[in-house]
Amino acid sequence: MTKKKAFTPLLYLASIVFLPWWISLSLNKSLESWVTNWWNTRQSETFLNDIQEKSILEKFIELEELFLLDEMIKECPETHLQKLRMGIHKETIQLIKMYNEDPIHTILHFSTNIICFVILSGYSILGNEELLILNSWIQQFLYNLSDTIKAFSILLLTDLCIGFHSPHGWELMIGSVYKDFGFAHNDQIISGLVSTFPVILDTILKYWIFRYLNRVSPSLVVIYHSMND
């Protein structure tokens, strides 16, 4: 019975780790064809930003010029003019579908992440007992560590997350999350987040050390500051 009680939280922890990946993969496969079909056939308008509109217009003009040049070389007016119009029409549809891939991926990834969040939230509420057991294990593990090990762990974690060498790691992480939600890569937004988010984390950490650790373990704070200096 004791082994079963110990095994259940571990099984729950493993499911928490692998469940998001499985849900995301399943939803992406099941929703992709539906979202693509809905966007390409049901939308009355095509949503393009200024950069996309300019780019697609340039490609359309280039395509039209190539078709016209081809027809001038062939010199067969009526039949080939009709084929020209059909060819331009088909290529225009392909161009629009190509530029619609970005919003399709944005909708797909954003919807998938929202559904994953809702499912995991419900799963966490249902597994409240297992979470309490895991939390007690973590607290017991941390309690058994010496103050020196705790201070070293905090220092290592803070240097990794908000140290002078961390911006590149934050850039990769934020870019990955940004891409996971289906948004197009934007250097300005990512740079803005990289320059502000670690600062906010640093402030929260210092406040936590000042308010919580000073009260719970003053010796740990002294060791931490000594190692940090």
UniProtKB/Swiss-Prot annotation:
Which Gene Ontology terms cover its molecular function?
antiporter activity; proton transmembrane transporter activity
Q: Which reaction does it catalyse?
A: K(+)(in) + H(+)(out) = K(+)(out) + H(+)(in)
Q: Where are the transmembrane segments?
A: 7-27, 114-134, 154-174, 189-209
Its record classes its membrane topology as: Multi-pass membrane protein
Q: Where in the cell is it found?
A: Plastid, Chloroplast inner membrane
Signal peptide positions are none
Q: Which InterPro entries match?
A: CemA
List the PANTHER family hit by this protein, alphabetically: CHLOROPLAST ENVELOPE MEMBRANE PROTEIN, CHLOROPLAST ENVELOPE MEMBRANE PROTEIN-RELATED
GO terms, biological process: potassium ion transport
Family per UniProt? Belongs to the CemA family.
Q: Which UniProt keywords apply?
A: Antiport, Chloroplast, Hydrogen ion transport, Ion transport, Membrane, Plastid, Plastid inner membrane, Potassium, Potassium transport, Transmembrane, Transmembrane helix, Transport
A GO cellular component annotation in the UniProt record: chloroplast inner membrane
Protein name listed in UniProt: Potassium/proton antiporter CemA
Its biological function? Contributes to K(+)/H(+) antiport activity by supporting proton efflux to control proton extrusion and homeostasis in chloroplasts in a light-dependent manner to modulate photosynthesis. Prevents excessive induction of non-photochemical quenching (NPQ) under continuous-light conditions. Indirectly promotes efficient inorganic carbon uptake into chloroplasts.
HAMAP family the record matches: CemA_PxcA
